[in-house]
């Protein structure tokens, strides 16, 4: 008999129902649960799959470069970045009638095209690419890299090339290599690219492989480096009248500490960015030589952790036992990695608009909105994933004996206190914030707006002032003309910072008021509630008062029947599932706030946000309803326009989102009856009944239906907001 899917589970392969297919897909990546899985095989499989992941990433980025080179307008855009719209790729659609062809023929193209809102044009332009040939070269290089990654993945599954478990668990060597090699050397290489290629290109000097070795990036070459006069590299920076991409107004400095933005491109100075990467490189290369490997010098992670026992005894055995716990648990490591990556991704969202690194990005409003929203949603999914794997760690990998009395055990021992404090914070934030919004809403409705409760965020304003924002008149630290910090800083560091922070044409330290105070606390409510659900899910994953043996049921059980007072909705999976809704909700508030605040800034009408954001109807009417008008106007009695794709996607997103509820609300019995009725009809319909299937159709399990429902909810939610965001922004600013 031919082997049936899934090969990794004989038990499942023999299941006579359609559960075999769905459950097979669901557990395909849960390597730990597969037949004949050993620790060694597990590590090797994951290691090899990383190369596959890299290959996919390189192929994708290669495709971006290739399509822009083939169908885009990069060379034309480079000549006039502020007035030509960047093209992502052509649209070939046989359904397009003449009005559609006309509506989507933009950016100087000869046929219908998609406009790029990803920021890749600005990025490629900033790092020194100028021609389609450059893009093709990059695309081919990445394609080659993808092929190399695939070969490497295959190679490391061959018997002679499989690394051993001890190699995977050698934490110090891995730390050294990742710190020095991955972060350090790559940052150094990037500094090299910026200094040798990007900065000369920004000054009108074209450096490629043919003249790479003959053009010195600095007039004095390496002489100041060896003479120890490094300050020479910071002398003569580009002037404020510098035209990016030309020699006009350019200087010779390569490593600066100017602060602020290039006046024309409104982006960070390239010489500042090079300096930053050089500093990071030095830091990480040094850090990558700190841990003890074969040479008997340096730190041992285990010794450091074992020594971390607070002397007063107030924290028990401190970090003892943590080294082996972390080093032997892939879920713990993945949880830590996801937590870090999630925070970094959210920081990218924040910094890409407040300190734009790419030339002319700040003037491309739709791209800024898209990049911010994209990175915040990605961050949300990654962060919730960190807690999911934390919970799986507690169920599968946590050993109470090994961790007796240390910080991990103590977290579990006083989890009630942690959970109840988080619960209290969430309740406090929720009731007070909603109370203020509702009060203000009623006052507006009754025609007495002066009776609103409006609270100035004085502490946040004070912090902004201490960083140099003079608007509020606090006269403190960098915003005080008599401050030592200010006077010392003028000549020493970041002379451009104070100009930037007090300039209203950028997004650095936005002016804040009562509307910001309220929405800040609404977001804080969302963050605390999401965290509460995730933390409770992880800390109760092994067991709770209601269900002490929860660990035996695994990560994703639906119920254990009505005994014990009802045990549905209490698995670690259920907590994760609920938290994702809260995460999406919270990031909704974050992106609404960011977008509305910036629409006012970009349109020169900050009063609208300030006046309308203090009550609920203001958000519903003056943000959501008002800005959806262009969207709904994609198709109208006069035909269609280039917003029609977003109008359609807006409706389609709502459809997908609403489909989610069908899976989230109805129960298994309903589906089982429906499926049996459909199967009955199929078997009795001529022609259709020639097609048979071997598996007996059964409804999805409760857990699977939840996953399908959640997936539709998430995808629909994000599709809907993406369409709204891009249409409302591009409709206003082109």
Curated annotation (Swiss-Prot):
Top enzyme category: oxidoreductase
Pfam families per record: PsaA_PsaB
GO BP, one annotated term: photosynthesis
Binding site for [4Fe-4S] cluster: 559, 568
InterPro entries documented for this protein: PSI_PsaA/B, PSI_PsaA/B_CS, PSI_PsaA/B_sf, PSI_PsaB
Residues that, per the record, bind phylloquinone: 671
Record bears the keyword Chloroplast: yes
Positions annotated to bind chlorophyll a B1: 654
Segments passing through the bilayer: 46-69, 135-158, 175-199, 273-291, 330-353, 369-395, 417-439, 517-535, 575-596, 643-665, 707-727
Binding site for chlorophyll a B3: 662, 670
GO molecular function, one term: 4 iron, 4 sulfur cluster binding
Membrane-topology annotation of the record: Multi-pass membrane protein
E.C. no: 1.97.1.12
Keyword Electron transport: yes
Catalytic activity annotation: reduced [plastocyanin] + hnu + oxidized [2Fe-2S]-[ferredoxin] = oxidized [plastocyanin] + reduced [2Fe-2S]-[ferredoxin]
PANTHER family: OUTER MEMBRANE PROTEIN, OMPA-RELATED, PHOTOSYSTEM I P700 CHLOROPHYLL A APOPROTEIN A1-RELATED
Subunit-level organization: The PsaA/B heterodimer binds the P700 chlorophyll special pair and subsequent electron acceptors. PSI consists of a core antenna complex that captures photons, and an electron transfer chain that converts photonic excitation into a charge separation. The eukaryotic PSI reaction center is composed of at least 11 subunits.
Function, as annotated: PsaA and PsaB bind P700, the primary electron donor of photosystem I (PSI), as well as the electron acceptors A0, A1 and FX. PSI is a plastocyanin-ferredoxin oxidoreductase, converting photonic excitation into a charge separation, which transfers an electron from the donor P700 chlorophyll pair to the spectroscopically characterized acceptors A0, A1, FX, FA and FB in turn. Oxidized P700 is reduced on the lumenal side of the thylakoid membrane by plastocyanin.
UniProt name for this protein: Photosystem I P700 chlorophyll a apoprotein A2
Species name: Staurastrum punctulatum (Green alga)
């Amino acid at each position: 008999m031919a082997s049936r899917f899934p090969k990794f589970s004989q038990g499942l392969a023999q299941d006579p129902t359609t559960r075999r297919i769905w459950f097979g897909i669901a557990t395909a990546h849960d390597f730990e649960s597969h037949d004949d899985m050993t620790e060694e095989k597990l590590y090797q499989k994951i290691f090899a799959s990383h190369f596959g992941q890299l290959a996919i990433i390189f192929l994708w980025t290669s495709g971006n470069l290739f399509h822009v080179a083939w169908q885009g307008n990069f060379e034309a855009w480079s000549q006039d970045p502020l007035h030509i719209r960047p093209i992502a790729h052509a649209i070939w659609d046989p359904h397009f009638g003449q009005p559609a062809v006309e509506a989507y023929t933009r950016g100087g193209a000869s046929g219908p095209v998609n406009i790029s809102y990803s920021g890749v044009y600005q990025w490629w332009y900033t790092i020194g690419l100028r021609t389609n040939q450059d893009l093709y070269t990059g695309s081919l290089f990445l394609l080659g890299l993808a092929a190399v990654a695939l070969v490497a993945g295959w190679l490391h599954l061959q018997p002679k090339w499989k690394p051993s478990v001890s190699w995977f668990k050698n934490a110090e060597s891995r730390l050294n290599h990742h710190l020095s090699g991955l972060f350090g050397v790559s940052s150094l290489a990037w500094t090299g690219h910026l200094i040798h290629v990007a900065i000369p290109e920004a000054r009108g000097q074209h450096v490629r492989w043919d003249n790479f070795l003959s053009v010195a990036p600095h007039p004095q070459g390496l002489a100041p480096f060896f003479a120890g006069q490094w300050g020479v590299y910071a002398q003569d920076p580009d002037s404020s009248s510098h035209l990016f991409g030309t020699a006009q107004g350019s200087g010779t400095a390569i490593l600066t500490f100017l602060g602020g933005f290039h006046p024309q491109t409104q982006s960070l100075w390239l010489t500042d960015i090079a300096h930053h990467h050089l500093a990071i490189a030095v830091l990480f290369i040094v850090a990558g030589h700190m841990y003890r490997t074969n040479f008997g010098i340096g730190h041992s992670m285990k010794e450091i952790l074992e020594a971390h026992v607070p002397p007063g005894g107030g924290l028990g055995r401190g970090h003892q036992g943590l080294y082996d716990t972390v080093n032997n648990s892939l879920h713990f490591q993945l949880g830590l990695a996801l937590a870090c990556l999630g925070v970094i991704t959210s920081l990218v969202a924040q910094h890409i608009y407040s300190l734009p690194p790419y030339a002319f990005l700040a003037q491309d409003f739709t791209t800024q909105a898209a990049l911010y929203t994209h990175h915040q949603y990605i961050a949300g999914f990654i962060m919730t994933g960190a807690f999911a794997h934390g919970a799986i760690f507690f169920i599968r990998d946590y050993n109470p004996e090994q961790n007796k009395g240390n910080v991990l055990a103590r977290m579990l021992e006083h989890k009630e206190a942690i959970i109840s404090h988080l619960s209290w914070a969430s309740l406090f934030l929720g009731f007070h914030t909603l109370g203020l919004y509702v009060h203000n809403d009623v006052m507006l409705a009754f025609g007495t707006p002066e009776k609103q409760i409006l609270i100035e965020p004085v502490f946040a304003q004070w912090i902004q002032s201490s960083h140099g924002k003079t608007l509020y008149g606090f006269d403190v630290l960098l915003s005080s003309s008599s401050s030592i910090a200010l006077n010392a800083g003028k000549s020493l560091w970041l002379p451009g910072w104070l100009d930037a922070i007090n300039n209203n044409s950028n997004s650095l330290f936005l002016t804040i008021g009562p509307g910001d105070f309220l929405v800040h606390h609404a977001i804080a409510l969302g963050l605390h509630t999401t965290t509460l659900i995730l933390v409770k899910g992880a800390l109760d994953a092994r067991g709770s008062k209601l269900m002490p043996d929860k660990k035996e049921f695994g990560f994703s059980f639906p119920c254990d029947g009505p005994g014990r007072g009802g045990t549905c909705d209490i698995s670690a999976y259920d907590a994760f599932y609920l938290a994702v809704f809260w995460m999406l909700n919270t990031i909704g508030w974050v992106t609404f706030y960011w977008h509305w605040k910036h629409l006012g800034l970009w349109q020169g009408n900050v009063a609208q946000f300030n006046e309308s954001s203090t009550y609920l109807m203001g958000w519903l009417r003056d943000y959501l309803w008002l800005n959806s008008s262009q969207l709904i106007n994609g198709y109208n009695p006069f035909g269609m326009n280039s917003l029609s794709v977003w109008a359609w996607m807006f409706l389609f997103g709502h459809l997908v989102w609403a489909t989610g509820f069908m899976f989230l609300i109805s129960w298994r019995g309903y589906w089982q009856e429906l499926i049996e009725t459909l199967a009955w009809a199929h078997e009795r319909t001529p022609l259709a009944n020639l097609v048979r299937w071997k598996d007996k159709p059964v409804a999805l399990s409760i857990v699977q239906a939840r996953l399908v429902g959640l997936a539709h909810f998430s995808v629909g939610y994000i599709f809907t907001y993406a369409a709204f965001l891009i249409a409302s922004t591009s409709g206003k600013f082109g």
